[in-house]
């Protein structure tokens, strides 16, 4: 297990950069924090020259990252991209109008769905290696979009932009891969509370070294949605989000009878299942949600559980005193997300299916799945709470998604990934 990362003051006194070669294989690490108010996640990186710690909203989508570029943005290494250059023309959506000579982009907030027009920028970004040296590795030509403070609405209060972890060639993982000639793959481990940090691991397909005990991943194919769900639609592109081939849902081993046609992404981009950190809880289309809740409540009777008054946004809650605590959370029916084969499933235990609500004299455990209505594009959106303390790998070279069930089964947590010094230094 690598030691905790050195403090920022040590980085400022003497920053050691690796001399990169085409065979560079040391993974890079970035801490992930959870925000109590929004229930969203931020990824910490070093940005600018001199390097400055910066927190960005973690998003499993978007074609490019974006950063607040107000009057306080100063960097000796930043430079704009001219219009009508091969680089500018390669972006999925750009604008070179209003007599501007600078390439402009349309950064988007995935939570509020706000967007705006702002200039593209190139600057330095750095992340530490996940080894004994914790050396900073410099990406000197990191491409992103500028944005104004308006676009930060709805994100964590300390977020200064968005880190795109989507399928795009200009996402953060893709630019790291291109710069270091490393595998186009990254691993996520989201923390379950704001008291701890998780981590993102870049430039490596390995995961066995992350924890003291061996943790195996189960894999399923990533599905390409042919139509992106973006605000700006003048140049339609495939989605940068991650869709998986979910074929059924089981509760306590019993399948729900879902209309299978809506579980497949069609040519207009509707249907299917995606993984999202823009949603705090898993969102189910109304017909699926009703089946899900009915079956869960029925199966809960075997645990001697009786529903009580629900707390928004949840539809089913139980008195906290009625649930038995286990090492994987409250004892409730298991939820299995079944993939391309019956023996390939993502099992969700109580720690990820239930949410504790204790406030105003109320103390309940609520089912952490919400009704998404009937008009959504994607009938199943797996949200952040269901992902916490699970190890996930997004391997674009092999077009596959690797996952575990809760790490608590292995007496492990995402906070074991020892990046607390980095995170504490930039809060």
Swiss-Prot record:
GO terms for cellular component: apoplast. Glycans are attached at residues 99, 169, 245, 259, 298, 304. Changing residue 409 to A: Almost abolishes the interaction with XEG1. Changing residue 411 to A: Almost abolishes the interaction with XEG1. Its EC number is 3.4.23.-. Residues 1-25 form the signal peptide. It is found in: Secreted, Extracellular space, Apoplast. PROSITE patterns: PEPTIDASE_A1. Its main location: secreted. Keywords: Apoplast, Aspartyl protease, Glycoprotein, Hydrolase, Plant defense, Protease, Secreted, Signal. Pfam families: TAXi_C, TAXi_N. Residues 41-404 form the Peptidase A1 domain. It is an enzyme of class 3 (hydrolase). One of its GO terms (biological process) is proteolysis. Changing residue 413 to A: Almost abolishes the interaction with XEG1. Transmembrane segments: none annotated. GO terms for molecular function: aspartic-type endopeptidase activity. Plants silencing GIP1 display significantly increased susceptibility to infection by Phytophtora sojae, and plants over-expressing GIP1 show increased resistance. Interacts with the Phytophtora sojae xyloglucanase XEG1 and xyloglucanase-like XLP1. Possesses stronger binding affinity with XLP1, a truncated paralog of P.sojae XEG1 which has no enzyme activity. Involved in plant defense against Phytophtora sojae. Contributes positively to soybean resistance against P.sojae. Binds the P.sojae xyloglucanase XEG1 and inhibits its cell wall degrading enzyme activity and its contribution as P.sojae virulence factor. XEG1 acts as an important virulence factor during P.sojae infection but also acts as a pathogen-associated molecular pattern (PAMP) in soybean and solanaceous species, where it can trigger defense responses including cell death. (Microbial infection) Possesses stronger binding affinity with XLP1, a truncated paralog of P.sojae XEG1 which has no enzyme activity. Is impaired in its inhibitor activity towards the P.sojae xyloglucanase XEG1 when hijacked by XLP1 binding. Belongs to the peptidase A1 family. This is Probable aspartic proteinase GIP1. It comes from Glycine max (Soybean).
